[in-house]
């Protein structure tokens, strides 16, 4: 069985010449060289070509400091790109409520296409056109907000650059917090507690108290734990299941907690909508 192959700047396998790791499965008897002067030279040139076709606004990019392309450029000591980019800059696609797509930063690695089609089975994006005109796009080149995207965010999670990012509405938040008559309410999910702890080096610790203190100082009036609302959702769903079971209602009963799952069901499997719970998600509870 072939091993999973990743992007073309990985190892290069050598038999009688150079071959890209992304398209060459390992075979018995192969001699593999991964860090020779010749390979480093070619990798550096490929990186320069990628950078020439990439938006260079790194200091204002949301991925600054976490960008895979930026990391590779530093590793290969690239401080200047020798090639010009003749392409005109495409518009930023901000039509989705969940993500923002910036084709100026796309390096056509295909990770977003793969996770959308093969992992999530949504198929909202794919490669379009060929050659120098190739790009990642929705069907008929529509905005992502008009496609069958469910807003799961997996494409943003695997994107190595800032081509797809989770939509940032913090500017709207600060604007509202500055209004004196605004009552600000925050809700913290368990996953957020873990992510914040990891980000600040508190691995394995409960930082809920620190999060509450920080939110208070920012200007929030009320802070709730999503776990409480999740308990209410479980109670409501249990009651609904018992009622359906006793009265011959539609079974099996599917949860309604995830908005992305609900949209996926609406787009792909509308016949199961009567099986979905009528309870609100914990965020809405």
Q: Over which residues does each language-model region extend?
A:
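Fe-S ferredoxin-like electron-transfer domains
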Residues: 14-151, 157, 164-176, 183
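Short low-complexity, flexible loop/linker segments enriched in glycine and/or proline
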Residues: 10-11, 139-141, 237-242
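Conserved structured core elements
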Residues: 6, 40, 106, 110, ...
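Single conserved hydrophobic/aromatic residue that forms the stacking wall/gate
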Residues: 2-9, 13
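Short glycine-rich, polar/acidic loop-and-turn segments at beta strand-coil junctions
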Residues: 11-14, 26, 36-38, 62, ...
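Iron-sulfur cluster-binding electron-transfer modules in prokaryotic oxidoreductases
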Residues: 165-285
């Amino acid at each position: 069985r072939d091993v999973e192959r990743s992007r073309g700047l990985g190892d290069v396998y050598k038999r009688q010449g150079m071959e890209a790791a992304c398209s060459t499965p390992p075979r018995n008897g192969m001699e593999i060289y991964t860090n020779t002067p010749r390979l480093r030279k070619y990798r550096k040139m490929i990186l320069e070509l990628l950078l020439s076709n990439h938006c260079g606004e790194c200091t204002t990019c949301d991925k600054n400091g976490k960008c895979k392309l930026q990391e590779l450029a530093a590793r290969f000591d690239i401080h200047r790109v020798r090639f010009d980019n003749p392409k005109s800059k495409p518009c930023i696609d901000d039509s989705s409520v969940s993500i923002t797509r910036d084709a100026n930063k796309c390096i056509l690695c295909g990770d977003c296409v793969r996770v959308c089609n093969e992992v999530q089975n949504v198929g909202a994006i794919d490669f379009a056109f060929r050659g120098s005109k190739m790009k990642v796009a929705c069907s008929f080149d529509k905005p992502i907000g008009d496609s069958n995207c469910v807003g799961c965010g997996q494409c943003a999670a695997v994107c190595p650059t800032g081509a797809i990012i989770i939509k940032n509405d913090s500017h709207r938040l600060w604007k509202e917090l500055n209004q004196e008559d605004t009552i600000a309410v925050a809700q913290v999910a368990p996953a957020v507690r873990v992510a914040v702890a990891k980000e600040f080096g508190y691995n394995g610790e409960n930082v809920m108290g620190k999060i509450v203190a920080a939110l208070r100082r920012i200007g929030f009036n009320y802070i709730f734990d999503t776990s409480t609302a999740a308990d209410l959702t479980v109670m409501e769903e249990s009651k609904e299941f018992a009622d359906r079971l006793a009265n011959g209602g539609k079974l099996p009963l599917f949860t309604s907690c995830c908005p992305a799952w609900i949209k996926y069901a609406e787009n792909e499997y509308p016949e199961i909508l009567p099986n979905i719970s009528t309870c609100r998600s914990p965020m809405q509870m």
